[in-house]
């Protein structure tokens, strides 16, 4: 079975999955990192930093006087992040915390990164309000993918609808994470204690022929989908994949909510 869980059992958090995802989106993520650099932070805290990929990217862009703190609950991921950071010439540290249970222990910073972590937080309203009360002067930078917008094709509409329905039935009520969390996130951000809310929707799109940096993420997404849908739908999806094994007539897109709050 294709595994995308980390050592703590969190879905879509396996180190290999995260690396493939990151490499696929380097252009978009680099552009956002440069936007954050224009805010001239002196300290950045990355909530759910996992293996440190975002901090590694920011390390190439931020001035060396900007301190980094990475926080995650998974010790294996933190060990990879620590190893990744050893060559950095800046003050860097990592903390093992459950960010929802230990929100009051989150250090203050000029920018708090919350990238695709909200699906793992049960009471998002309480988390945001506690975070704002604890760190009232910093900027909260949010990036949240929308599981409902992930689309690959071209594909017959009936087949697509069946696959999407199967996937929702399988994971829509998962107790491990919320794959369809963009609307809950948007509502929670809007009614939080943050006063300023700058938001946009970022389109990630690729059309064939695909760049080789994108292919592992694309194929991983299809394999992950196959293992959650019904056997009948998985057979159809596998047949569809085999009809174009060289990826000459394919597209992929998804949408992320991107927000800066203060």
Per-region residue spans from a language model:
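C-terminal helical/coil "lid" or tail adjacent to the Rossmann-like core of SAM-dependent
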Residues: 4-16, 198-251
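Conserved class I S-adenosyl-L-methionine
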Residues: 41-50
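Conserved catalytic/acceptor-binding region of the Class I
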Residues: 141-209
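Conserved alpha-helix/loop element of class I SAM-dependent methyltransferases that forms part
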Residues: 23-40, 57
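Helix-to-beta-strand junctions that scaffold the AdoMet/dcAdoMet cofactor pocket
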Residues: 63, 121-122, 135-136
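Class I SAM-dependent methyltransferase SAM/SAH-binding core
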Residues: 53-101
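A short glycine-rich, Lys/Arg-flanked "PGG" loop and its adjoining helix->strand segment in the class I
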Residues: 125-139
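A short SAM/SAH-binding and catalytic strip from SAM-dependent methyltransferases
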Residues: 110-124
